[in-house]
Design a protein with these regions (language model features):
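Alpha-helical transmembrane segments and their helix-helix packing motifs
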Residues: 1-317
Length: 317
């Protein structure tokens, strides 16, 4: 497969996944903002959202130091100058799909194209302002639809596997950022909190942002504990959005696009996966969760760079 074709496929799925992840964290923040809480807690929640995407400097340059929820929502949803906003991600996903339209099935192309057209219509008509949660659910649904149509109609050849690689590298990156920022915020908020309800809503909101609330209940059958939330989102191989689950998918799909045992990309991915496989959550927490996740993000970024050099078009996207 031509590297440029693989590049477009990789970024098509990566941008679609990024739009979904942004919708997830925005929805949870919006729902949490409706609960009784201090102004400081509310402010920290919205600032944390910008930190997850490393967009605080860009936001501050446009809106100033005061973080207002409405401004954050506009910046992360409809700002076309913000490359990580939902509208920008869906536009970029569609443009990458259009570039390789002949490689995709009709159903996949129509899904990407219709999603882009529909999100523009919804933002112009005021649907987002009338019901933000419904809008975020729609974004998540369209991402699910894109993956489902891809799995249900695409030949499982190299094109299919590059699509999957984009999805799971992006998902691993997002989950690591989410856990890092939310657990860091928890140190400040929960250290002074005596309200058990607050404790519950904080951790349950993290789980809901990755569709993990019901999974947690099924796996642990107990009250929500921070160390178990971390274990679920980092080390559980059967959790769809865990770091280990994502790296398993990355390795499986890499194996389908190269049989070269000396591939540096496969070597790095395999080492990162094995480090997660044999890690224990108590050791991670004892050594410092932030340090662990920072190192993980660095290694994922390096993995993406090696993948680009080996298979894709090595440009900054």
């Amino acid at each position: 497969m031509l590297s440029r074709t693989a590049d477009h496929l990789f970024w098509m799925s990566r941008y679609t996944e990024r739009a979904e992840n942004t919708a997830r964290i925005l929805d949870v923040n919006y729902q949490t903002s409706l609960l009784p809480q201090s102004a400081t807690s509310a402010q920290a929640g919205w600032e944390g959202l910008l930190s997850i995407s490393e967009l605080k400097p860009k936001f501050t340059a446009k809106y100033g130091e005061n973080v207002i929820p409405r401004d954050v929502m506009d910046f992360m949803v409809r700002d076309e100058k913000n490359s990580s906003s939902i509208v920008s991600c869906l536009k970029n996903a569609r443009e990458n799909a259009r570039a390789v339209r002949g490689t995709l099935t009709t159903e996949v192309w129509e899904t990407e194209n219709q999603t882009h057209l529909e999100v523009i219509r919804m933002l112009k008509s005021g649907d987002f302002e009338r019901d933000p949660s419904q809008f975020f659910e729609w974004v998540k649904f369209r991402s699910h639809l894109s993956r489902g149509v891809t799995a249900g109609t695409m030949l499982q050849d190299e094109a299919f596997h590059f699509l999957r690689l984009g999805t799971f590298l992006e998902r691993a990156d997002n989950t690591a950022r989410l856990v890092d920022v939310k657990f860091h915020a928890a140190k400040k908020e929960l250290a002074s909190a005596t309200d058990e309800d607050f404790d519950f809503y904080h951790w349950s909101s993290i789980l809901r942002s990755v569709s993990g609330f019901e999974i947690y209940r099924k796996v642990y059958r107990d009250v929500i504990r921070p160390e178990r939330v971390a274990e679920l989102l980092i080390l559980r191989p059967d959790m769809p959005r865990s770091l280990l689950g994502c790296l398993n998918e990355v390795m499986n799909n890499l194996a389908m696009v190269t049989s070269d045992a000396n591939s540096e990309t496969r070597r790095r991915a395999g080492k990162l996966r094995s480090d997660l496989q044999y890690a224990k959550i108590d050791e991670i927490l004892a050594n410092g969760l932030h340090a662990f996740l920072t190192q993980f993000l660095d290694r994922v970024n390096e993995l993406g760079a090696h993948l680009s050099r080996e298979f894709l078009v090595p440009t900054t996207t």
